[in-house]
Structure formats: C-alpha cells, structure tokens
Amino acid sequence: MRIPNLKDLLEEGVSGRCVLVRCDLNVPLGDDGAITDLGRVTASVPTLKALLEAGAKIVVAAHLGRPKNGPDPKLSLEPVAAALGEQLGQNVQLVCSTDRSPVGGDALACVERLTDGDLLLLQNIRFDPRETSKVDDERLALAKQLVELVGSAGAFVSDGFGVVHRRQASVYDVATLLPHYAGILVADEIRILEQLTSSAKRPYAVVLGGSKVSDKLGVIESLATKADSIVLGGGMCFTFLAAQGFSVGKSLLETEMIETCRSLLDTYADVLRLPMDIVVTEKFVADSPPQTVAADAIPDGLMGLDIGPESVKRFATLLSNASTIFWNGPMGVFEFPAYAAGTRGVAEAIVAVTGKGAFSVVGGGDSAAAMRALSLPEGSVSHLSTGGGASLEYLEGKTLPGIEVLGREQPRGGDS
C-alpha cells in the first residue's frame, strides 16, 4: 500500500490551513520534573518546521506517561512545550483547558486565534480517558472533537512513530475522519524497518537485550529466519541459559518461558548466540561489588547484571563482519556504572562497523537511552529509532493500527 506523506500534503498546500499533528513527546523526566532526554522532541522538529515554513496553523497532540483518573500535574506537557519552543525558535502555546479534557472549550478558542505559522500544543491527550479507551465509540467521540479543532479543511499528520502500534483516538481514529499523511519521522521509520524485513544486506546480525523473553519472543521467531545471527543478552538471556540446564542463581528468570526457549535453541541453534560469561553480584544496587563468572556456573545467591568481557569480545567479533545490524535492548543494567560495560562494548562494536559502511538500526526505548547515557553520538549509527514497541511489532510482521489506517482511502475531510 502507498501511504501519503508530508510532501503530498505540502504540494496540496497548507497555507492558512489548520493541521493536526500527532507527535511522540513522551520524554523521560527526572525527580525534579526536568526532561532528561530530548531525543523525541528533537525528532519531531523536522515535520513541524516544514509545516510552519509552509504557513500552516499547527495543533499538536501528544502524551506523557500513563495518567490514571484524569489530569495529573506531574504529567503536564509544560516542560515539553518549553523545550519544543526552544528547538523551533518560536513560542509554543500550551493549552491548559479548564475542562478535564485537553480538547475542551478553551482549546477551541485558542485554535481560533491562531495565525499562519503558529503552533499550539494541547495538554497531555491521555488526560482524557477516551484516548486509550477500548470502546470504539468513546475513542471516536474524542477524535471528532480533535477534528472540530482543525475544521473541515484541516488535515492530519501522523509523526509519532512510538505510538503507531496503539489503536488510540489521536493515532488511529482521527485518521479515519481527516485527510491523513505520514510525517517525515514516520515515513523514515517505515522505510528503514521495511529494509530490515525485506532487503537487508547480508550478513545480517540482530542484537536483542532487555529483561524479558516474552517481550522479544515474536521478533526472535520472525528474524531467526532472516538474520544470520541473533545475539542474546540482558536479563532475557538467563531464561535461555536455564533452558540449557544451567543454574542462574538469583538472576531474572521467566520459568514459564523455559520450554519455549529450549525449543528456540533447538530450532535455531545455528543462529542464536548466548553469552559465555556473566558479571554477577549479590544485590541489585549500583554499588554491589561485581565479579565475573562463566555463564554455565552462576553461583546460588548471586544474580547476573551484565554480560562479561569475553562475551563482549565474541559478540564484537561477530558484529565486525556484519553488513546490517538491528539492536534492541541493553546487555545489562547500564544505569549502574559497574554493569554498563557489556552494553557499551556492544554499542561501540556497532558504531565501529557502521563507520566501515555497515547499515545499523538501534531500536527505541532503552537502547536509544543507553546510546545517549554512554555519550555515543546519535550520528554514529545509521538510524536511531524513536519507537521501541512499534519497531518490534513491525519487525514481527504485526499490523500496526496507526500505519494501516494511513494506507486507507482518504476521507473527504472533517465533515465525513
């Protein structure tokens, strides 16, 4: 299917038109409420700038966190509005409606005052429980209010790749009502992930980490037939080690997944690669003393928090021969300096082979956060995705509601 994109919309003309843009501005916040990683704000800028320069009036919908029972001051988009305004070089008005919903009467009045080249950010769209409702009519009602904001001549641009796997009002339902287009970010993500699934240059190496096998099972099964090797690290590797009959001490373990892991190891023995040594400790705290042990000899009473140095060397050698690499999930608890070496080593190996011409994609979420936490430049890999869950579901071959709807026939506008 062909998905209309921002270029199509700009060719139609947006000067004087109101455009609703769904961005992913779900940034991490520190204890003081300050943004600790601006990656998603920065990624939203190209689409917004293109529309502003073309004279559009922009209404941005976005969320922050998972508010329960309505508005939560701790999850206000106020710091996001300030950061976005700084990056765009212009004022970004945050609409704080007196209604419980971000699309209440105040929002409509603010939109009516917009002039060409203005941008307005709605308050956290998830403050309205209809955004994430499982009831179609409830989501559709909110979508219709969003359409009312931009009017019958308006358009919808989907540029929040991190939420396209969600069937939510501002992601899916609004696209059934307005002419819809993929923003620059979403179009790029689709193009790159499609390359990983259908035309990846071999050898193709996949690096998977994170805590749970259950979170990565689908992508392991999907990519095991496409990749030449799949490196497994992070907390999920201990369930695979247990499936081989090894003791894993107090390490993270999904006992209900052991048989599944055993089956995967039997079926894809020539593809799956496990660590040979593990950095273990007694307690899950940053200053708990580390020691390195063989992966098949983790002592009782100790837990693994990182892959060991021999594993890093082995994985780095494997990656050095790859032409295509996809990485999702850290190799250990990189937030603890004593247990960050595995993630750093693998990341540096990916950066090195990228510098020699390999095509590398780093999945969103913790992997992207690790790159930044370890002070590795974003430009040192070919593509740093903004969507963790969305990237994985796409690679699994699942239908992503927010992408599927963009490929549908265009509605006639806000009155359809």
UniProtKB/Swiss-Prot annotation:
Q: Where in the cell is it found?
A: Cytoplasm
User: Which reaction does this chain catalyze?
Assistant: (2R)-3-phosphoglycerate + ATP = (2R)-3-phospho-glyceroyl phosphate + ADP
- Asked whether the UniProt record includes Nucleotide-binding among its keywords, one would answer yes
Q: Where is the signal peptide?
A: none
Family annotation (CDD domains)? Phosphoglycerate_kinase
Main EC class the enzyme belongs to: transferase
Which GO biological process entries does UniProt record here? gluconeogenesis; glycolytic process
**Which cellular component, as a GO term, is one annotated location?**
cytosol
From what superkingdom does this record's organism come? Bacteria
For this protein, the record's InterPro entries field holds: Phosphoglycerate_kinase, Phosphoglycerate_kinase_CS, Phosphoglycerate_kinase_N, Phosphoglycerate_kinase_sf
Q: Name one GO molecular function term.
A: ADP binding
* Quaternary structure, from the entry: Monomer.
- Which named protein is this? Phosphoglycerate kinase
